[in-house]
Amino acid sequence: GNENPDAGTIVTGQTVAYGYYTQKGIKFDERKTVLETIKDIAEVIHYGKDKTYSADQLLAHFMFPYSMHRQPVSLLSGGEKRRLYLLTVLVSNPNFLILDEPTNDLDLLTLQKLEDFLHTYKGCLLVVSHDRFFLDETVDQLFVFEGDGKVKGFIGNYSQYHDYLEEKNKEMKRDIAAQKQEVRNERPTSERKEKRSYKEQKEYE
């Protein structure tokens, strides 16, 4: 709903709950504690099959030790605020999760924790990323932008798509080589015909 469609209409199902992690982030009420910031959204998050995290368990899982839970948000570093922002998205229990370039601002350990979480995530996940390693860990289908407004769907992760492109390129080279070989095989025949025609012409003369 942040952008109006160029054409047509968007109909969202009644049970669809979006979670959107943006590059811009959000502005926190920095007077609130870390735990209050999460509990204001939800106290329990569901994941996997019949599993739940409480707000404090989710914080601990994402490397906010219990000693930090009563700490005001104003004391957090920039990286910690990005991590807390991620948790505000996850704790909203979305069944359609959108992650916009998450590897740009999150540290390696946070990304590993996020990957672990997404492995058990049962909803629809849409990731915008240039990080092929993160894509390999989290997605099983790609939308590839080919330019000129063309988008191609591919079933598989990034490495599988890369292998597909390499094999397609090899097939193209084999086809070109085969076509060149056909041309070489045809050329001597035509040349012999031309020579015979010239000899026959001389004998005729």
Segments from the language model and where they lie:
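ABC ATP-binding cassette signature C-motif
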Residues: G1-E205
